[in-house]
Amino acid sequence: VQIKKRTGRLHPITKFEKETVALFEKLGFQRFDAPHIDSDYNNFEALNIPSNHPARDLWDTLYIDSQKYGIEPGKLLLRTHTSNSQIRIMKKFKPPTRLMIIDRCFRYENLDARHEHTFEKFEIVYIDKNLSMGNLQYLSEYFLKNIFGEEIKVRLKPKYYPFVEPGAGVDGECIFCKGKTEKQIGRKLRV
């Protein structure tokens, strides 16, 4: 009796992550990692999100019982975004800088079909002279067209974010219904 050899497959998130990293490596970006457990300072304060800033109301933070480790309560947490890498990058590297962060983030969420306490986030830190919103638009289109196909329609639009200025949102038209459905869910992809 011959036993059929088992073969494994990459998890879809892992596969997507590898594709994304390869795309941005072609443009000269390098991967950068930051810790999952971090200080309140790196996660909020260093990003101009002080304790009373309205941006902190946009997510619920998972704080760690830091007194066990001799750290002031409320000062140690599971990062809520990959942006905790930004202060480290700016301290460690001189411009021009092309780095990407793709990793897990954690938020205290009411779990449902669209919300989970752990999720993956991708972000780039691109610091150089003469960069503009045009560069952001190009990188957004480059990413979406390479992942979802050249036919995807992409739109960059100004958007208010309390922690960054200027801010922009990127919409990608649904590749299945081509934006024809009346339902909001599944019609657009937010980047």
Listing of model-derived features with the role each one plays in the protein:
Residues Q2-V191:
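TRNA-recognition modules of translation machinery and tRNA-sensing kinases, especially anticodon-binding
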